[in-house]
UniProtKB/Swiss-Prot annotation:
The keyword Amino-acid biosynthesis does not apply. The active site is at 2 (proton acceptor). InterPro entries: 4-OT (IPR018191), 4-OT-like_dom (IPR004370), Tautomerase/MIF_sf (IPR014347). Transmembrane segments: none annotated. Keywords: Isomerase. It is an enzyme of class 5 (isomerase). Belongs to the 4-oxalocrotonate tautomerase family. This is Probable tautomerase jhp_0858.
Length: 68
């Protein structure tokens, strides 16, 4: 059973539920096409990571966004 975990830091209110559905469908279709997996067995999880819980270069994404 393929298990795919997508981690996103939401920006500007997104992703929307429709965009999440498109990601789930698109990633599942790609697994079928590239790895010949059974679509019914593919699990896709989308984790939305708060910008205070993710850092780059020693600073939180929240802090970096405030600087720009």
């Amino acid at each position: 059973m393929p298990f795919i975990n997508i981690k996103l830091v939401p920006e500007n209110g997104g992703p929307t539920n429709e965009q999440k559905q498109q990601l789930i469908e698109g990633v599942s279709d790609l697994m079928v096409k590239v790895l010949n997996k059974n679509k019914a067995s593919i699990v896709v999880i989308i984790d939305e990571v708060d910008s205070n819980n993710y850092g780059l270069g020693g600073e939180s994404i929240h802090h970096l966004r405030q600087k720009n």
